[in-house]
Amino acid sequence: MRLRHLILPLLAAPLLTACVNDGATYEIDNTREHVLSLIREQPLFWDSKVDLFLVVSRMPSCMRRHSLGTGSPVSKVEVYQVPSGAFIIKVGKRMFVTETQTCEGFAKLSEEPAEGMGELKGTFQVKKGELVFVKEESGEASATQ
């Protein structure tokens, strides 16, 4: 009887480790107070999709979590900044706009803005099995977390 209680958790452990629950952060002003963070959640190990969330934060003033829908575990998420200071988030063909003044502004875009996407700041992507933010730096990128 005691052996059964030990074997059951050991059999369940590999199933739980297959789930994705991680995140990476883009530090806007090179500070931890003003950031965009991407969170990936895969609550069911057999599901091939992950739920994507964007956390917009300018501490201590505001912080909000917005849903970006679903994606694959290796989906790339691009971050652009327009001259007004707003950010355009691109997940595949889907685009969203958000801001960090109140952290409340968030909307899905049906098409690329007429004035353009703005400056590419970097991309959230999986490298060596880990979600990282790869900052766009004058033609060459460097991985940061």
Which residues are covered by each model-predicted region?
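Repeated scaffold domains used in trafficking and secretory/extracellular systems
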Residues: 21-27, 70-82, 116-123
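Sec-dependent bacterial lipoprotein signal peptides
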Residues: 1-19
